[in-house]
Amino acid sequence: MITVKCFARYRTLLGFAELRLPVVPTLGDLLTDPRLAPLPKDALLAVNQSFADRATPLADCDEVALMPPVSGG
């Protein structure tokens, strides 16, 4: 299983703080899950605490983090 963790406003947007999903080949495949449909395209993505893109391969027990973009000055 893959553990998906949502941070900041994405917890409210997606309706969960943590979700477990079956293993799929890539992060992009994982993001096609209907429960993740509201996720904005500019979301920051990480796999096992390293920034990742949609082509990043996934494996059993990976942790995926979904974070809103950071802004400020």
Each language-model region and where it sits:
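Ubiquitin-like/PB1-type beta-grasp interaction modules and other compact soluble beta-rich domains
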Residues: 1-72
